[in-house]
């Protein structure tokens, strides 16, 4: 089953529509566990993908100083220490993982070849559509 968002994956589990799901964002499962749902995350022994959420200042931004201030705020102790309470891994190694989740250093991460993905993007999209439509 293909759905349109990470949250929809978690919802199919909490409603009992599915017993298992493959998902790229543990945050929603973590929040559901916090609410008492019996959802378990399995970290594959052969590796999991880490999907970053970058904060950047775009070249030519109309207010670069404000953008830099926001970027600095996003990596500050104040913000980074809020993330685990929402089931999100912080981007800094000095911040504990979400409660009950292993530290990132204990999760085998799969390397992602972004250049190859970019080269193969059209073929990958075509193949995806062939399989799932």
Q: Where are these predicted regions, by residue range?
A:
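Periplasmic-binding protein-like
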Residues: 73-97
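Short beta-strand->loop
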Residues: 33, 37-49, 58-60, 99
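A bilobed periplasmic-binding-protein/Venus flytrap-type ligand-binding module shared by bacterial periplasmic
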Residues: 52-63, 82-83
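Solvent-exposed, acidic/flexible segments
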Residues: 2-7, 60-67, 117-121
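Binding-cleft/active-site segments that stabilize strongly anionic ligands or cofactors
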Residues: 50, 63-64, 76-77
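Extracellular/periplasmic bilobal clamshell ligand-binding domains
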Residues: 99-133
